[in-house]
């Protein structure tokens, strides 16, 4: 049984009903409908912390999805799960792939910056200041891109950029 049919939450049920109605009345291809169903089920599983199931649904959603904008969000969510699982290299790969299709995803730039900042902090703890500086510089570049897209957001990142004299 598809995940969308077993949600117990009223809001989830309502959203599922509305989404199903929209899928029936808006002209879409069977591939688009299939991709959306997998994407919706992936989001539901992800919100419940069922990351393996969410990944499976997202990977399935990428097969029929051809729209670059919609595909970017699928790839972004795959990146989120890899980040949550501590698989930072994989996460960065999926954020890059999402940004290739949709360069206006400030949250992807932010998440990439957070990973780079984390790796910089790890390098500091390991006593490698040169590597730490390189990771921090990369984090700064990603945060600058996120801030450029949404200037009122990422206040902590803006403060970090100012404190570290990386803000231009």
Swiss-Prot record:
The keyword Membrane applies. It is found in: Plastid, Chloroplast thylakoid membrane. It is a peripheral membrane protein. One of its GO terms (biological process) is photosynthesis. PROSITE patterns: TPR, TPR_REGION. Keywords: Chloroplast, Membrane, Photosynthesis, Plastid, Repeat, Thylakoid, TPR repeat. GO terms for cellular component: chloroplast thylakoid membrane. InterPro entries: PSI_Ycf3_assembly, TPR-like_helical_dom_sf, TPR_rpt, Ycf3/AcsC/BcsC/TPR_MFPF. It comes from the Eukaryota. Its main location: plastid. TPR repeats lie at residues 35-68, 72-105, 120-153. HAMAP family: Ycf3. Essential for the assembly of the photosystem I (PSI) complex. May act as a chaperone-like factor to guide the assembly of the PSI subunits. Belongs to the Ycf3 family. NCBIfam families: PRK02603.1 (NF002725). PANTHER family: CELLULOSE SYNTHASE OPERON PROTEIN C (PTHR44943), TPR REPEAT-CONTAINING PROTEIN MJ0263 (PTHR44943:SF8). This is Photosystem I assembly protein Ycf3. The lineage of its organism: Eukaryota, Viridiplantae, Streptophyta, Embryophyta, Tracheophyta.
